[in-house]
Design a protein with these regions (language model features):
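Membrane-water interface at transmembrane helix exits
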Residues: 21, 25-29, 55-59, 63, ...
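Transmembrane helix-loop-helix hairpins at the membrane interface
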Residues: 121-236
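Cytoplasmic juxtamembrane interface segments
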Residues: 51-72, 205
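Alpha-helical transmembrane segments
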Residues: 3-20, 77-82, 161-165
């Protein structure tokens, strides 16, 4: 019965995150005749409230120690491992690119046409903030802090790590991809983050690693932008 309560809670959190928050953001944008930027900003604020609620829920429902251990400099080696994993991921996706299937990109709700007429604004920057900020925080709070403290906590067979990695892979399979290769990739990422969280009990570390992993995707376009800006403004 205890596990059932946690399972239903996790499903409820994902339902709220993937569907209800979007409806609320679109409704508020429509009422105030806002832009895409306004909608994405609303979504970020709503997700911040959801993360705060999840943390409060966890503190109430499970034994949870949110004290942060002292930062250790050898943690930096894990960031190098993230780079290696990202390079390996790119290599695998390049080899099997014909088998990578993205989930249908269909919005759950329709925005008024007037929203699009106002332009994108800074929505790209806000999506970037989501990718390296609220997204990793939300996923690590759920998949690491919640799942690993609610199910098989400190299991000597590392079932907590396996479950965390499995759910991380399944979530990306449901919401972003439709192929087994992507599932394996995110399952490995999930095991990596879960193993580090179990070893060091530092949610900050796995959030930063996850955030850095997502940021690494943007390194090339950011470098191209900086190079072009310097070239055309100072060298030509």
């Amino acid at each position: 019965m205890k596990y059932l309560k946690h399972i239903l809670s996790i499903l409820a959190f994902f339902t709220i995150d993937q569907f209800i928050l979007e409806y609320i953001a679109v409704y508020v944008t429509t009422v105030f005749n806002g832009s895409i930027t306004f909608m994405v900003l609303c979504l970020l604020l709503l997700q911040t409230f959801l993360i705060s609620f999840i943390v409060l829920w966890m503190k109430k429902e499970i034994p949870l120690n949110l004290k942060f251990p002292k930062w250790k400099w050898f943690y930096l080696y894990f960031f190098l491992l993230v780079i290696l994993l990202s390079i390996l991921e790119a290599w695998v996706k390049n080899i099997f690119h014909n088998f990578i299937v993205l989930a249908p990109s269909v919005s759950n709700v329709k925005l008024p046409s007037s929203v699009y007429l106002k332009g994108a604004g800074i929505s790209s920057i806000l999506f970037f903030i989501y990718a390296i900020g609220t997204g990793p925080i939300k996923e690590e709070v759920i998949f690491r802090a919640y799942v690993m403290n609610a199910f098989f906590k400190n299991n000597k067979y590392h079932l907590d790590v396996l479950l965390s990695g499995l759910l991380f892979g399944v979530a990306h399979l449901v919401f972003r991809y439709r192929d087994p290769i992507s599932f394996v990739i995110y399952f490995v990422y999930g095991l990596f983050f879960a193993g580090i969280y179990k070893k060091y009990k530092d949610i900050r570390l796995v959030i930063l690693l996850h955030s850095f992993c997502n940021f690494y995707v943007y390194v090339k376009p950011i470098w191209i932008f900086i190079y072009n800006y310097i070239f055309w403004n100072f060298l030509v």
